[in-house]
From Swiss-Prot:
Function statement: Joins adenosylcobinamide-GDP and alpha-ribazole to generate adenosylcobalamin (Ado-cobalamin). Also synthesizes adenosylcobalamin 5'-phosphate from adenosylcobinamide-GDP and alpha-ribazole 5'-phosphate.
UniProt topology in membrane: Multi-pass membrane protein
Matching InterPro entries: CobS
Alphabetized UniProt keyword annotations: Cell membrane, Cobalamin biosynthesis, Magnesium, Membrane, Transferase, Transmembrane, Transmembrane helix
Organism, as annotated: Thermoanaerobacter sp. (strain X514)
Protein name: Adenosylcobinamide-GDP ribazoletransferase
Domain of life: Bacteria
Length: 250
């Protein structure tokens, strides 16, 4: 029963899907929902796939993919790309650590954040459009899973830059190998039914490598990770996966 509660809480935390269930959880136990982030990715990928099937016969591929990317942000409340924008505003402000963290917390978008947001949206549309039509559904299903698993991986290898403040701070420094192992097994088990395991492992390995580099670089700059930088990790991991899918032929 506890695991079901954590799964529902993960869905509520990571999406804007209407789930009218109130769940009480101890703050000290909140980090355990990370194990189920890939299932959130499965649900998002499934919804995007159905959306693609519904639109593909009525619009050009470019227009369909524009709708897909836009809808993906509607499903998540744009929380990850907002984190990407805030991260770029902070990291490229040329300020000290405390000032960078303050800038990331500011709800206003700066030039660097706007550029990061625009480039991410454009690149996602571009690579989705250029993925082989035969594996488009595969890419739509798998990419959100990789993005969420990358968040879990990043939380496992870093600590909180804010000393445990914020929702990200409830998990950073607490998510360990157990949570990542569960998330990893869920991801592998799901992918087994969608594409060849060897292909998934290659794409996942590249995405996790990018996640490692990004997470360590950010940690070097601000002393750890935040909820915003975890959002950036998700976006960059998803973009990496899409780039890989462009070169895949199944």
């Amino acid at each position: 029963m506890e695991e079901i509660k954590r799964l529902v809480l993960a869905m509520q935390f990571m999406t804007h899907l209407p789930i009218p269930i109130e769940i009480d959880v101890e703050k000290s136990e909140f980090y355990k929902i990370a194990s189920y982030f890939p299932i959130v990715g499965i649900v998002i990928g499934g919804i995007l796939s159905l959306f693609y099937i519904a639109l593909k016969d009525f619009f050009s591929r470019e227009i369909v993919m524009t709708f897909i990317v836009a809808f993906s942000y509607v499903l998540t409340g744009a929380m990850h790309i907002d984190g990407l924008a805030d991260t770029f505003d902070g990291l490229f402000s040329n300020k000290d650590k405390s000032k960078m963290l303050e800038i990331m917390r500011d709800s206003r978008l700066g030039t660097n954040g706007v550029l990061a947001l625009v480039f991410m949206v454009v690149l996602k549309i571009l690579f989705l459009t250029n993925i082989n039509e035969n594996i488009t559904l595969t890419a739509l299903l798998i990419t959100p899973i990789i993005g969420r698993l990358s968040i879990v991986f990043s939380m496992m290898i870093t600590k909180s830059a804010r000393g445990g403040e914020g929702l990200g701070g409830l998990m950073l420094g607490k998510v360990g190998i157990r949570e990542f192992a569960i998330a990893f097994v869920i991801s592998i088990a799901t992918s087994y039914f969608i594409l060849p395991l060897a292909v998934f492992v290659k794409i996942l390995t590249i995405s996790l490598f990018v996640t490692y580099i990004v997470s360590k670089y950010i940690s070097l700059r601000i002393g750890g990770m935040t909820g915003d930088t975890l959002g950036a990790v998700n976006e960059l991991a998803e973009l990496t996966a899409l780039i890989c899918f462009v070169s895949v032929s199944l």
